A protein has these predicted regions:
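Extended beta-strand-rich architecture
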Residues: 1-195
Length: 195
């Protein structure tokens, strides 16, 4: 489904010896396939716009075959779709996760086989990659019979555990009124939004 290359870390899944059924024979290394299926199922049932999320665990083996327990990572996967949804709507939702924890994420251009090449970014926190966001490729949307564009994000919550429950500090309100201005900039296409 994701079109991952053979050496992709997401392909290094742990196979269960006695699964409930063949569809559940691998421990998840990403929540993306289930989110893609959930979005497709909703669209097939007539829900042409929506937002869903899942908080679940993914299991990253240190070595295969297993010699020690895998790294279990609590992860949130967010999916949105519809005429009014776009990359920046999803980025706003991811920023809301950061604001809730009183932290800032950084976004850097990225490439993933299942996401649109120019509408994809990796999410960094303190310089460490903790997730990604982007639009599903047209090929996946067509393969899953999606009628509306879909976007997904995946964030490693385990990497954010150190900031859970920290009390923020606040600055006093300024005595001077805030002024906002509308500003348009003209620059080269090679300049990224982070610069």
């Amino acid at each position: 489904l994701l079109g991952l290359p053979e050496d992709a870390p997401e392909r290094k899944a742990i196979r269960l010896i006695n699964p409930i059924n063949e569809d559940l024979s691998l421990m998840r290394t990403t929540l993306a396939p289930q989110m893609i299926h959930a979005i497709a199922r909703n669209q097939k049932n007539g829900c042409l716009e929506g937002r869903v999320y899942e908080i679940g665990n993914k299991f990253i083996p240190k070595d295969l075959p297993l010699t020690e327990y895998p790294d279990e990572r609590e992860t949130i996967c967010i999916g949105i779709w519809g005429k009014e949804e776009n990359f920046f709507t999803l980025k706003g939702l991811v920023d809301t996760v950061a604001e809730t924890l009183f932290i800032d994420f950084e976004y850097v251009e990225d490439k993933k086989t299942f996401l649109h090449p120019y509408r994809t970014a990796k999410i960094l926190y303190n310089g460490e990659e903790i997730g990604y966001l982007g639009q599903l490729t047209y090929e996946i949307q067509k393969e899953e019979d999606m009628r509306e564009s879909a976007y997904i994000a995946e964030i490693d919550l385990k990497a954010l555990r150190p900031v859970y429950g920290k009390v923020p500090t606040f600055a006093p309100i300024s005595r001077f009124a805030k002024e906002t201005r509308d500003l348009a900039l003209v620059m080269s296409k090679s300049v990224t939004c982070g610069e």
